[in-house]
């Protein structure tokens, strides 16, 4: 997909995260569930899909004609990084045709000792036409990743790193400051549970939104409502 066409398609819109980890009820070994989630999202007006693993991404791209933000979650010894951590995952995501390749952009080092910014620079050197999104938690991380070549910066990791522990609600001030200071397009992701929050995130300066738990993870949403 042409970059400008993609930008125009997702601007101001809702990207739905369709993911199920192995311990979750909607996970199956053969897949097939997340493409159905993606179809439902597409029929309801989603402008894109965020998905994990080559299998799910491939099945989703066959099911819907929407841009896909692709990741591969994998734990590595010696680092808290787990979202598209090495070039091996990058190669696999590029090979399956992700429209936007998302990587963890937080301050921890990767297994080879590289920073998120260095990793993004390496991706852009190898795949100069590939759109890259950095999942960040702080203003400084977002700026560093954008300066390294990230086309999008997501607020995905805010509240999930030692530096941002306790940030359990969507922070509109953070989104606004990030949109003012960071040269990349900002994608608000994480802690968005209600339509009013989505609207305020866009008003704060987000280019687009990613929502998962409130739409495609019934366990997460039920827990939120029940407690």
Model-derived features with residue positions:
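Short loop-to-alpha-helix "cap/lid" segments that border enzyme active sites
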Residues: 116-122, 137-139, 147-155, 165-183
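Catalytic beta/alpha-barrel core
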Residues: 47-53, 82, 100-112, 131-137
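Short beta-strand/loop segments at the ligand-binding rim of alpha/beta enzyme cores
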Residues: 13-14, 64-75, 125-133, 181-189
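Conserved small/polar residues in nucleotide/adenosyl-binding loops
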Residues: 222-227
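Conserved N-terminal beta1-alpha1 strand-loop-helix module at the mouth
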Residues: 2-88, 140
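Catalytic cores of alpha/beta
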Residues: 88-89, 139-148, 193-206
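Glycine-rich phosphate-binding active-site loops on the catalytic face of alpha/beta enzymes
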Residues: 102-109, 154-163, 206-221
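Surface-exposed amphipathic alpha-helices with a cationic face
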Residues: 7, 42, 57-62, 117-127, ...
């Amino acid at each position: 997909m042409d970059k400008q066409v993609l930008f125009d398609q997702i601007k101001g819109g809702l990207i739905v995260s369709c993911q199920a980890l192995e311990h979750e009820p909607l996970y199956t070994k053969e897949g097939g569930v997340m493409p159905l989630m993606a179809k439902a999202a597409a029929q309801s007006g989603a402008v894109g899909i965020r998905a994990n693993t080559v299998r799910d991404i491939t099945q989703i791209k066959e099911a819907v004609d929407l841009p896909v933000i692709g990741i591969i979650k994998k734990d590595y010894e010696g680092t808290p990084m787990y979202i598209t951590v090495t070039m091996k995952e990058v190669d696999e995501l590029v090979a399956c045709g992700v429209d936007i390749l998302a990587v963890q952009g937080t301050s921890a080092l990767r297994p080879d000792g590289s920073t998120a910014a260095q990793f993004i620079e390496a991706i852009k050197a190898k795949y100069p036409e590939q759109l890259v999104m950095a999942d960040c938690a702080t203003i400084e991380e977002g700026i560093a990743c954008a300066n390294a070549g990230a086309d999008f910066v997501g607020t995905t990791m805010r509240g999930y790193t030692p530096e941002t522990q306790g940030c359990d609600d969507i922070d509109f001030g953070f989104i606004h400051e990030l949109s003012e200071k960071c040269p990349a397009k900002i994608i608000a992701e994480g802690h968005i549970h209600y339509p009013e929050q989505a609207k305020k995130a866009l008003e704060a300066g987000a280019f687009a939104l990613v929502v998962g738990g409130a739409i495609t993870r019934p366990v997460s949403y039920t827990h939120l409502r029940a407690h």
